[in-house]
Amino acid sequence: MSEDGQKIISANKYIEVANSGAFTSTNPKGKIVVAGSSSVTPVMEKLIEAYKAINTNADIELQESDSTTGITSTSDGTCDIGMASRELKDTETALGLKATVIAMDGIAVIVNNNNPAEDYTVDQVKDIFTGSAAKWEEVK
């Protein structure tokens, strides 16, 4: 991602990941469709805005949905760029899809004050959300 893009990432409270220099105008032609994750959408809106400021004839359509839709739409050609807030699965990379990380975000797990849940590890939270542990007493 460009230096200018990383400034946008940082300004929107995401963690920068890479820097490849400044934006430059490429005089693009045609339309690009970007689709996927609602958690990526706010920063993508800013990136598109900055890109269009330099490439005034750029035609970019942004479609907000979810990570899986973004990945599937990229795979089937419905969109040009998919947005995902998760890593690609092996089955998705086997289709030839390639992930380019533009930022990192944080996820918080919040429980009610009356819930005795405390100090769970990432693996324990994963067990809860994947269904491996369906009851609190099953969390090990």
Located regions from the model:
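Flexible loop/hinge segments at secondary-structure junctions
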Residues: 1-140
